[in-house]
């Protein structure tokens, strides 16, 4: 399925995005102050200490068989009623509401792209790992490539990586690390978390979504790349072609966060219809 007819999706959302969603953007992703800062910093300190090449490979092996649980997409959404993301400085309410906020923001700006609406609902479902006993530092937060030196825009980079053993490795501590120039992000080992898990889960269960959807899910938390432009030395032409979709998605992932919670019961039938269309039935997680 190809969805390349609109090469710059931002042209649509700049016109149609709600004013409430666009205001006060500078207040989001504040990693210098705020009531949740201590919790957020502690999560990233653990993440940046223990996310290594060896750790990520072990997690791929542990979860790659998708034998944790069998359930529908909507059952996974309901599970997120019990999760508050400890890496998020912006919200302190269950992640299930954020899923519907994101999806509805996309639906308003892109009414003709129902697959994109569903991506909004799906994007954080990999966080069910935190409800399966995984520590949040191995599930939530911004992602980054392992096996190479963290670049400047990684959150808390200068004060959280001191104890990461990979940074003592003569190869992994270089800018390219274990990668070839412009190898493509599909060939990069990203820090383990809900993005990579959900991407692989969708592939395993053969979701009938376009390539853009899989790409958004896999890299939506890779802020050092899609927001700050770092890690260009690893990117290829496909990454640059997909970047506008990830950036477009990010507007809704980030700027729809609000303490005004959606009426989930009213929205549920519409999204159940999308699930039935693109990823029906009981799935392997």
Curated annotation (Swiss-Prot):
Alphabetically ordered keywords of this record: Cytoplasm, Iron, Metal-binding, Oxidoreductase, Phosphoprotein
An annotated Gene Ontology molecular function: inositol oxygenase activity
Keyword Metal-binding in annotation: yes
Residues that bind substrate: 29, 85-87, 127, 141-142, 220-221
Source species, domain of life: Eukaryota
Region of interest: Disordered: 1-28
First-level EC class: oxidoreductase
Assigned EC number: 1.13.99.1
Reaction catalysis annotation: myo-inositol + O2 = D-glucuronate + H2O + H(+)
Comp. bias intervals (Basic and acidic residues): 15-28
Name this polypeptide is given: Inositol oxygenase
